[in-house]
Design a protein with these regions (language model features):
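Mid/C-terminal beta-alpha module of Rossmann-like enzyme folds, strongest
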Residues: 212-247
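Conserved Rossmann-fold NAD(P)-dependent oxidoreductase catalytic core, especially the SDR/UDP-sugar
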Residues: 95-136
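Glycine-rich NAD(P)-binding loop of the Rossmann-fold in SDR/ketoreductase-type enzymes
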Residues: 51, 84-95, 131, 135, ...
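NAD(P)-dependent short-chain dehydrogenase/reductase
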Residues: 151-197, 202-206, 238
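NAD(P)H-binding glycine-rich loop region in Rossmannoid oxidoreductase-like domains
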Residues: 50-88, 102, 116, 122
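Active-site Tyr-X1-5-Lys
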Residues: 132-158
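Rossmann-fold cofactor-recognition segment
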Residues: 41-52
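N-terminal Rossmann NAD(P)H-binding glycine-rich loop of SDR-like oxidoreductase domains
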Residues: 3-24
Length: 247
C-alpha cells in the first residue's frame, strides 16, 4: 500500500486531495498547523509546523512516505508579518525537501501559484514568459519552486502553477454573487464584464496530483482551462441555469 504525506492536509485543498487519494486505496499522512478532525482507518494527522524538525523526523521515520504532496503555505493576505510568511513558504519548503532527500522520497508534487507575473501585460502571458512576481506570496512560491528543482537527479518534482482553487464550501466572492442571482438581484460588475479570471475545480487539481505520481521526471505545469470565460459569460450561464431574473 502506497503512503503519501500531505503538508497542509487540514486545509481546503489538502482535504479534497486526501479524500481523493484515500479513495484510490492509498494511506495518507497529514501535517498542518490546524487540527484535523477528519477520520479514516488509513489516515493519520499530525498538528504542527513543517519547520519543526523533531516532528518531521517522526513523520518521515514512522510512515516512510513514497511521495509528498506539498500544499502547505501561508496565503497572500498574511502581510502583517512578512517574515512569518517567508519562513513558512520558503524555509518550510526547504525543510520538507531536506527530509524528503534524507528519507529517499522519489517524488514531490508542489502546489505553486499562477501569480508569478507582474500586472498590466499588453498581451497574454505565455509559458515562455519569465516569472517576475511583485508580491511577497508569489516571490515565496517561486523560491519554493527553485528549491524543489535544485536536485532533479535525486527527487522528481512536479510543480503545478495553479489558479484560484474552488469547490463546494469555497466559492469566495462568487458565493455572494450566486446568492444575488438566486435572489434575482442586479449584479455588480467591474468594468464591462469582458474581463476573465481563471479558477480551477479542486477535484480536477486532485486528479492532476494523482496523475503526477506516474511522472519519472521534474517539470512545471501551468494548469487550468484552455477556454476561460468572461465574467459576463459566467454570470449569464448561472442566470440561465437557475432561471433567475438577475441581470
Amino acid at each position: 500500500m502506497s503512503c503519501y504525506l500531505i503538508t497542509g492536509g487540514a486545509g481546503f485543498f489538502g482535504t479534497v486531495l486526501k479524500q481523493h487519494l484515500l479513495k484510490q486505496g492509498a494511506e495518507c499522512v497529514s501535517i498542518d498547523l490546524e487540527p484535523d478532525s477528519f477520520q479514516h482507518p488509513r489516515f493519520t494527522a499530525y498538528q504542527g509546523d513543517i519547520n519543526d524538525d523533531s516532528l518531521m523526523e517522526k513523520i518521515f521515520s514512522v510512515h516512510k512516505p513514497e511521495a509528498v504532496f506539498h500544499c502547505a503555505a501561508l496565503l497572500a493576505h498574511v502581510k502583517k508579518d512578512l517574515k512569518r510568511l517567508w519562513h513558512a513558504n520558503v524555509d518550510g519548503t526547504r525543510n520538507v525537501y531536506d527530509f524528503a532527500l534524507k528519507y529517499g522520497v522519489k517524488k514531490i508534487v508542489f502546489i505553486s501559484s499562477n501569480c508569478l507575473w507582474a500586472k498590466n501585460f499588453d498581451s497574454p502571458v505565455t509559458e515562455d514568459e519569465e516569472p517576475n512576481p511583485v508580491e511577497i506570496y508569489g516571490k515565496s512560491k517561486l523560491e519554493g519552486e527553485k528549491i524543489l528543482l535544485s536536485q532533479p537527479d535525486k527527487i522528481n518534482s512536479i510543480i503545478f502553477r495553479s489558479p484560484t482553487i474552488m469547490d463546494e464550501g469555497r466559492l469566495g466572492l462568487l458565493g455572494i454573487l450566486f446568492e444575488f442571482i438566486d435572489e434575482g438581484r442586479k449584479l455588480p460588475m467591474v468594468g464591462d464584464g469582458t474581463n476573465r479570471y481563471q479558477f480551477i475545480y479542486a477535484k480536477d487539481l486532485a486528479k492532476a496530483c494523482d496523475l503526477a505520481l506516474a511522472a519519472d521526471y521534474s517539470e512545471i505545469f501551468n494548469i487550468g482551462a484552455d477556454d476561460v470565460k468572461s465574467f459576463n459569460e459566467v454570470y449569464q450561464y448561472v442566470i440561465n441555469k437557475s432561471g433567475s431574473g438577475s441581470r
